Amino acid sequence: MSNNSREKSVDSSELSNIDYRLFQNTPAWELAKAVQEEDMDNFDKIISENPQIINYQESKYGNTLLMLTIINQQLKPFKALLKKGAAVNTHNTFDGTSPLIEACSSKYYNIIFTKILIEYGANINDIETGKRRQENSTRLTPLMAASKTGNLDLVRFLVSNGADVNYQNEFGQSALSESIMTDNYKVAYYLLQNGANYNLPIFYRYDYSIPIENSVPGDKGKPMFLMDVLKEDESDFYTDEYKYKTLIIDFLKEQGVK
C-alpha cells in the first residue's frame, strides 16, 4: 500500500484486524505507520516524545500495536515494542484475546513470537476475557489455541513451561477437546501423555429429533467421551491421524476405558 493511499481516510468498520489503518485519526497513528514500515529511527523518536501511546488500543477490535505485529508477523517492531515496555497481558475488546493467545492461534505463525512473549512475562495460562459474542462460543487459553492449530512444537513448548493441560472453560472445552475436534490426534496423544483428563466429555451431542416443546431447559445433550468420538472417526488408514488415533485408543484401553 502506498503512503498516499494509506493516508486516505477510511471507515474503520470495514477494516480487518491486520490493518494498521485502524489507528487512523488516533494519537497512535504516527507510531502505527512507523511500526508498519519498520522505521525504527522514527519509532524511537515518537516513543521518546510520547511513551504512553505504546499501549493505545484501536476502537474496533481493541488491539494494540504489539498485537498487530504478531498478526502481521513483523518480528523487528515486535521486539522493539517489547523493549520499550509494551504490555504483554492486555486483552482486546473483540474476543478478549491477548498477545500470547494470538501468537498461539495460527499454525503459520513463527513460534519465536510466543517464546519472546513468555520471556517478557506473558501469562502462559491466560484466558480470553469478557462476554462472548453471539457467534463466538469459545474462551481460549494459549494452549487451547495452539492445540487447535496442530502445532506440536508449540504445544510442547507451552506444556514444558507450565501450561495447564486440564483447564476447561464454561463451554466444556479444553486443550484435549480442541485437538480432537480438529483431528489433531498427534497433539491429543501428547496431551494425554502429559496428564490431560480423558474422562471429561469432548462435546455434547444434542438430539434434534426431540421437539422443542419437549426439550428439557439447559439440557446440553448426550456427552460424547473421547473413546466414543474416536470410534466414529473415519481417518484414512495410512495417515498420521489414523496412526495417532490408534495410539490414543491403545492408551485409553490401558487405562481401562472401553
Tell where the protein language model's regions lie, with residue ranges.
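Ankyrin-repeat-protein effector appendages
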Residues: 2-30, 161, 194, 199-258
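Ankyrin-repeat intra-repeat helix-capping/turn positions
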Residues: 38, 73, 107-109, 150, ...
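N-terminal segments that cap or nucleate solenoid repeat domains
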Residues: 10-61, 65-68
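Conserved ankyrin/ankyrin-like repeat signature
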Residues: 42, 76-77, 112-113, 153-154, ...
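Ankyrin repeat domain, specifically the short helix-to-loop turn at the C-terminus of the second helix
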Residues: 47-53, 79-87, 115-124, 156-164, ...
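Ankyrin-repeat boundary/"N-cap" motif
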Residues: 24-31, 56-65, 91-104, 127-142, ...
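Short coil/turn connectors between adjacent alpha-helices in alpha-solenoid helical repeat scaffolds
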Residues: 105-112, 236-242
